[in-house]
Amino acid sequence: MTGRCPTVAVVGAGMSGMCVAITLLSAGITDVCIYEKADDVGGTWRDNTYPGLTCDVPSRLYQYSFAKNPNWTQMFSRGGEIQDYLRGIAERYGLRHRIRFGATVVSARFDDGRWVLRTDSGTESTVDFLISATGVLHHPRIPPIAGLDDFRGTVFHSARWDHTVPLLGRRIAVIGTGSTGVQLVCGLAGVAGKVTMFQRTAQWVLPWPNPRYSKLARVFHRAFPCLGSLAYKAYSLSFETFAVALSNPGLHRKLVGAVCRASLRRVRDPRLRRALTPDYEPMCKRLVMSGGFYRAIQRDDVELVTAGIDHVEHRGIVTDDGVLHEVDVIVLATGFDSHAFFRPMQLTGRDGIRIDDVWQDGPHAHQTVAIPGFPNFFMMLGPHSPVGNFPLTAVAESQAEHIVQWIKRWRHGEFDTMEPKSAATEAYNTVLRAAMPNTVWTTGCDSWYLNKDGIPEVWPFAPAKHRAMLANLHPEEYDLRRYAAVRATSRPQSA
């Protein structure tokens, strides 16, 4: 049987980009080019290298189901170990020669049935399908703190760690109390002379231990791959149960809250405990996983500051109460612009439609992967994907399989371009909005899950429902078209 040979561009060589590329190659779709702005694969795990960096999803779950690693050294892997895993995946599946490193896609426009891409070097290329896999959290957010440029010490964002800066014995300020801030305090305590954590909002912490895997355990996992499969299924089941607490009020949510509150009681000083107690429900913000934070924050060389930051001067940080906190290094653990998606790429779809105009009221998509008006364009980890405390590898695999099913239909000549119908997309998003009031994200907090109107942009159901949704294609929800220019130039391929 013969079919056409689709050309596919994937933007991003992180976890999701490599996942969709491997899925394409496994389906016999080989004309694939990956554009990567940096000089290595890995995305988040390449960019983030700060002390204490640890994945908050278990190692045996935060991996591709088709490439399980028997050699994880601990339950929650360090960032460097995950980066090594992703580098190994790139080698194992022959991805490196398909990647254009140091190439930032600055624009992509749909023209006569194909996508025309332009990189920052001015190079243009034309493809049948464009897949954005630029990740969720990759644009560092720098807070507008007055006087930051006046500081005579060193300032950097946690995702742009400066490894030339000595840490031993230094006075280090950590601004931010999310997962990164918590991991930094744990990683710097006992190394720095003093760590001062500046807290705007207290976070709920789930005390998940992080035991190391013995050499014997790794030997057994190498000898018996079924053990890795069993562990993967067991962790998947536990996170499905956790999802019930997120999407529905009831016993599961109460149990998670009870564990968080019990852990907080380990803080002995009543004043410190009150300062660390959030005024919202557990899981309303992204839950912080740490078995060591409450121990670290009680050290004599660690201080929690809850007064707001007024400004920065050359010696340090001045808070609203007029106190000067003298420091040598300021680390901004202030998160990312979670709504930027594939920026800085300027996306122009059918009839000159610009993504900035379509998304002026907030990002939205059909079934988390496609957008009306942008034919043959897909997103990995798009709006309302199950992100947060879920294993993104599993989410990426489901989306990659769905995308490849569409491209295989193109290969067999069923259509030239496809895009979701506006009515189908609106109906889908109406269902999502109707489910949001039951979720924990609407219980009264401000987080990066929310758009500018305070509406969560995450998946309001269990991950299993997301997988089921993507398991089948629904052509009736898509506008399938023919383009003479596409059919005239498409190359045949054995299928």
UniProtKB/Swiss-Prot annotation:
InterPro entries: FAD-bind_Monooxygenase_sf (IPR051209), FAD/NAD-bd_sf (IPR036188), Flavin_mOase-like (IPR020946). Pfam families: FMO-like (PF00743). GO terms for cellular component: peptidoglycan-based cell wall. It comes from the Bacteria. GO terms for molecular function: flavin adenine dinucleotide binding; N,N-dimethylaniline monooxygenase activity; NADP binding. It is an enzyme of class 1 (oxidoreductase). Keywords: FAD, Flavoprotein, Monooxygenase, NADP, Oxidoreductase. Its EC number is 1.14.13.-. Belongs to the FAD-binding monooxygenase family. Its cofactor is FAD. This is Uncharacterized monooxygenase Rv0892. The record marks R286 as: Transition state stabilizer.
